[in-house]
């Protein structure tokens, strides 16, 4: 895929912070080059590469990848400014509460319908159906611990919660809505001790027995690699974060072939698969472009 180019997102962020202007030469879909935005997350870069490679295989279009978009807000502003033509990964729960300013919706189908309708109405953007994975917070334990304590759901933690050590990312304890305070209100119990830490440290902490349970990201590859167990959120406390691509209707009108290409990925990547792909990058240190290509080849997208 020699036509795929990487564009430095730091310049994009700098320009937007100064005045919301588009970068020179990056405004909209021009010269048959489609600019695909990837957030600064492993799975976003993997999926962005899948989209780019499929577009270049199936069409006569070129692609450029704009990576390291540091937040959902930065990604959204980049699309509003015409600096990217495709958002590779947008999450229903995030855009529902942040971009749209609406109350969290716990039903995945309803949440998806709301963001699809509102993005069409407010921005003339097409929010596609989900790839098939949901990257949400998930209470996670070792399988050995789950068997010993007879735990399968979050509610099962309640019996001995006062004895458990919980590792969480730094921000969650103070988050409004789906943070610790809301959790206690919904589930009716507190943990004996909570330990805030960087999200990347929670997996080793629970694997090595430093923590009894941790709050993880459901698509992180270490969940599968470390043979951890995600507990069912039986009271549906966390809102859904189903992942989808988003494209302005203007771009689809200029390049109608894009919709068919994108639809090839819809519903084809479940949470377990995304865990595996993420681990190929984070655990085995493969490049996202290589992992994307291997997935597409394995599933006969290039045949």
From Swiss-Prot:
- Subcellular compartments: Cell membrane
**Lipid linkage positions (N-palmitoyl cysteine):** 21
Query: One biological process GO term for this chain?
Result: amino acid transport
Lipid addition (S-diacylglycerol cysteine) is recorded at 21
**Keywords assigned:** Amino-acid transport, Cell membrane, Lipoprotein, Membrane, Palmitate, Signal, Transport
Output the InterPro entries linked to this UniProt entry: ABC_Gly_betaine_transp_sub-bd
**Induction entry:** Repressed by OpcR.
Q: Name one Pfam family in it.
A: OpuAC
Q: Which membrane topology describes this protein? A: Lipid-anchor
Do you know which SUPFAM superfamilies this protein is assigned to?
Periplasmic binding protein-like II
Extract one GO molecular function annotation from the record: transmembrane transporter activity
Which coarse location class applies to the principal site listed for this UniProt protein?
A: membrane
| Gene Ontology cellular component terms for the protein in this record | ATP-binding cassette (ABC) transporter complex
Q: Where is the signal peptide?
A: 1-20
> What is this protein's function?
Member of a high affinity multicomponent binding-protein-dependent transport system for glycine betaine, carnitine, and choline.
Assembly and interaction partners: The complex is composed of two ATP-binding proteins (OpuCA), two transmembrane proteins (OpuCB and OpuCD) and a solute-binding protein (OpuCC).
Q: Which family does it belong to?
A: Belongs to the OsmX family.
Q: What is this protein called?
A: Glycine betaine/carnitine/choline-binding protein OpuCC
Q: Which gene produces this protein?
A: opuCC
């Amino acid at each position: 895929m020699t036509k795929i180019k990487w564009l430095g997102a730091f310049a994009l962020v700098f320009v937007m912070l100064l005045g919301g202007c588009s970068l020179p030469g990056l405004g909209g879909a021009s010269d048959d080059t489609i600019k695909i935005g990837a957030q600064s997350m492993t799975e976003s870069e993997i999926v962005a590469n899948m989209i780019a490679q499929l577009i270049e295989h199936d069409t006569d279009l070129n692609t450029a990848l704009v990576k390291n978009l540091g937040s959902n807000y930065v990604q959204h502003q980049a699309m509003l400014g015409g600096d990217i033509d495709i958002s590779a990964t947008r999450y229903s729960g995030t855009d529902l509460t942040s971009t749209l300013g609406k109350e969290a919706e716990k039903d995945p189908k309803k949440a998806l319908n709301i963001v699809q309708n509102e993005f069409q109405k407010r921005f003339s953007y097409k929010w596609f159906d989900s790839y098939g994975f949901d990257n949400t917070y998930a209470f996670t334990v070792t399988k050995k611990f789950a068997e010993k304590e007879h735990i399968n759901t979050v509610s099962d933690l309640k019996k001995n919660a006062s004895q458990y050590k919980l590792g969480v990312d730094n921000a969650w304890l103070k988050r409004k809505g789906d943070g610790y305070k809301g959790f206690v209100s919904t589930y009716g119990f507190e943990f004996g001790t909570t330990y805030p830490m960087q999200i990347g440290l929670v997996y080793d902490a629970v694997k090595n027995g430093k923590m009894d349970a941790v709050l993880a990201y459901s698509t992180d590859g270490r969940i599968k690699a470390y043979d951890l167990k995600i507990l069912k959120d039986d009271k549906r406390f966390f809102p859904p974060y189903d992942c989808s691509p988003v494209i302005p209707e203007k771009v689809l009108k200029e390049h109608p072939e894009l919709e068919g290409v994108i639809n090839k990925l819809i519903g084809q990547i479940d949470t377990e698969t995304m865990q595996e792909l993420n681990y190929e990058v984070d655990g085995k240190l493969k490049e996202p472009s290589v992992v994307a290509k291997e997935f597409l080849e394995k599933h006969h997208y290039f045949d």
